[in-house]
């Protein structure tokens, strides 16, 4: 079985990462490609007994997420990661662990993310009860050279872009 790619989707909270991941997953399933979505929130809930957001907690979480994605890719499964991963160092580490990484940047303006926020994250950040939210209290380090830039989670052209660069035979594109 040949290795597959990791598609690492990054962007501000509520930018459309999960929606993009699900659109990509649907396309891959229709193509008969084994795939799995690792949504950062879901993985954190499933694997972290007492989730925290300190720098150390985040370092550990993103390392775990990258290792899990790389493990799936080595087993022939396209791993689709949807996680804020607001520091370049997190994404760089993922690329070290998964050399066939395709980085997708969901480029959604902060104001739009705040309007779409169904979890109330931005309201909590403004009130001080979520002081660690990337984009408000912490900087979001946008990727300098992402493989794909998407305008929100419903950018079908960007989904097609991922499919075009996805290794078809397990070799790097």
Task: Show the residue positions of the predicted features.
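Small-molecule kinase domains that catalyze NTP-dependent phosphoryl transfer to phosphate-bearing small molecules
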Residues: 107, 115-173
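Hydrophobic anchor at the beta1->P-loop junction of P-loop NTPases
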Residues: 9
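Phosphate-binding P-loop
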Residues: 1-4
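Conserved substrate/cofactor phosphate-moiety recognition/catalytic segment
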Residues: 22-70, 74
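Conserved lysine of the Walker
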Residues: 17
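Conserved beta-strand scaffold positions in the cores of enzyme catalytic domains, especially
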Residues: 37, 101-105, 147-149
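Glycine-rich phosphate-binding loop used to anchor ATP phosphates in small-molecule kinases
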Residues: 56-102, 106, 112, 122-125, ...
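Walker A (P-loop) phosphate-binding loop of P-loop NTPases
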Residues: 14
